[in-house]
Swiss-Prot record:
Biological process annotations from GO: intermediate filament organization; positive regulation of epithelial cell migration
Family: Belongs to the intermediate filament family.
Coiled-coil residue windows: 90-125, 148-239, 297-401
Taxonomic source organism: Gallus gallus (Chicken)
Positions of region (Head): 2-89
Gene for this chain: VIM
Localization terms from the record: Cytoplasm; Cytoplasm, Cytoskeleton; Nucleus matrix; Cell membrane
Protein name (database record): Vimentin
Domain IF rod: 97-405
PTM characteristics: One of the most prominent phosphoproteins in various cells of mesenchymal origin. Phosphorylation is enhanced during cell division, at which time vimentin filaments are significantly reorganized.
């Protein structure tokens, strides 16, 4: 029996060279039968079986001799020349079969070793795959979820801080608007107070001018009063002188009319008129002076009140200006802090986005690696399936050969030679018959698609 494997077999595809995924495997077995007319017919067969430990057991080749020659007489000599030739050819075939069996055993041992190695690699890959499925993915998912929760929490905190700062900014803006409105009102009130103060100053100036105008008539009246007093005194002295002269004349001349009484009456009349005029002038002057003093006091009070209000407004303006400056400074600092927080938030958000992208890339790489491991595992499964199919095919072939070998075959020890007359019997030409069993197995991706068997008989 001879074993031939084509180049497209899965064994050569995996270990002997590359070929396409779909190939056909052709196994050719042959059995040779030798017939020698009615003399000897050797039949050879071999069987190879794989033990669990990888040890191969070979059953010996038996030779089946069948004789159709007529019985020989005991006194005739037996010619073993043909038997020696057949034994020589049988030994040569036996040697060739042993060599071929040794080669097949070596190849099968290498095949078993490679199958075991692939099974170990398959177990390692399965363990790694289970480890990745059980630990790596969940741990990475937990880390990713934890990182995402931290990022979301920080984003929410920054959003709340931003909203709080915006509310504070809006409140400060409202306070600044109210202060500006109040400042505008205070400035308007200040302008009104200044205009009122200006009008009061004008009134004071007018009152001062009126007082000056009134002081001049008073002075003129006082001068007139002094002049009238002097004139009155002169008239009184003249009248007294005249009265003395008249008294003397009266004394001298009693019969003259009484001028003293007349002068006294005139004097009384003049004095009453002068007193009345003086009293009226003093009363008018006092009333005018009282009015002017009262107006001046009122103007002074108004001026003092206006000055106090102006000072108060000035102090309020200064305090409001300080508050506005302080609020401007605090607003600028808050705006600067808000810009810094926005920049920090943007930077942190970019960093978190980069982290998320990196984690997603790592997850994608892990998924691709898992997919690659799964593909490799699937390829190994396909290879294992193809190897299992080939092993099953080998097993079927070996079982077929074993079934043929296990048939009862007589040996040389049990061979009975009968007496025959070789010279009287013609020797039939030796010929051989070869039976070819061609089995074609088509596989694709480790699966058997088609399996056919053909038998061919050739004569030699």
């Amino acid at each position: 029996m001879s074993f031939t494997s084509s180049k497209n077999s899965s064994y050569r595809r995996m270990f002997g060279g590359g070929s396409r995924p779909s190939s056909g495997t052709r196994y050719i077995t042959s059995s040779t039968r030798y017939s020698l007319g009615s003399a000897l017919r050797p039949s050879s067969a071999r069987y190879v079986s794989a033990s669990p430990g990888g040890v191969y057991r070979t059953k010996a080749t038996s030779v089946r001799l069948r004789s159709s020659m007529p019985p020989m007489r005991m006194h005739d000599a037996v010619d073993f020349t043909l038997a020696d030739a057949i034994n020589t050819e049988f030994k040569a075939n036996r040697t060739n079969e042993k060599v071929e069996l040794q080669e097949l055993n070596d190849r099968f041992a290498n095949y078993i070793d490679k199958v075991r190695f692939l099974e170990q690699q398959n177990k390692i890959l399965l363990a790694e795959l289970e480890q990745l499925k059980g630990k790596g993915t969940s741990r990475l998912g937990d880390l990713y979820e934890e990182e995402m929760r931290d990022v979301r929490r920080q984003v929410d905190q920054l959003t709340n801080d931003k909203a709080r700062v915006e509310v504070e900014r809006d409140n400060l803006a409202d306070d600044i608007m109210r202060l500006r409105e109040k400042l505008q009102e205070e400035m308007l009130q200040r302008e009104e107070a200044e205009s009122t103060l200006q009008s009061f100053r004008q009134d004071v100036d007018n009152a001062s001018l009126a007082g000056l105008d009134l002081e001049r008539p008073v002075e003129s009246l006082q001068e007139e009063i002094v002049f009238l007093k002097k004139l009155h005194d002169e008239e009184i002295r003249e009248l007294q002188a005249q009265l003395q002269e008249q008294h003397i004349q009266i004394d001298m001349d009693v019969s003259k009319p009484d001028l003293t009484a007349a002068l006294r009456d005139v004097r009384q009349q003049y004095e009453s008129v002068a007193a009345k005029n003086l009293q009226e002038a003093e009363e008018w002057y006092k009333s005018k002076f009282a009015d002017l003093s009262e107006a001046a006091n009122r103007n002074n009070d108004a001026l003092r009140q206006a000055k106090q209000e102006a000072n108060e407004y000035r102090r309020q303006i200064q305090s409001l200006t300080c508050e506005v400056d302080a609020l401007k400074g605090s607003n600028e600092s808050l705006e600067r802090q808000m810009r810094e927080m926005e920049e920090n938030f943007a930077v942190e958000a970019a960093n978190y986005q980069d982290t998320i992208g990196r984690l997603q890339d790592e997850i994608q790489n892990m998924k691709e690696e898992m997919a690659r491991h799964l593909r490799e595992y699937q390829d190994l499964l396909n290879v294992k399936m193809a190897l299992d199919i080939e092993i099953a095919t080998y097993r079927k072939l070996l079982e077929g050969e074993e079934s043929r070998i296990n048939m009862p075959i007589p040996t040389f020890a049990s061979l009975n030679l009968r007496e025959t007359n070789i010279e009287s019997q013609p020797i039939v030409d030796t010929h051989s018959k070869r039976t070819l069993l061609i089995k074609t197995v088509e596989t694709r991706d480790g699966q058997v698609i088609n399996e056919t068997s053909q038998h061919h008989d050739d004569l030699e």
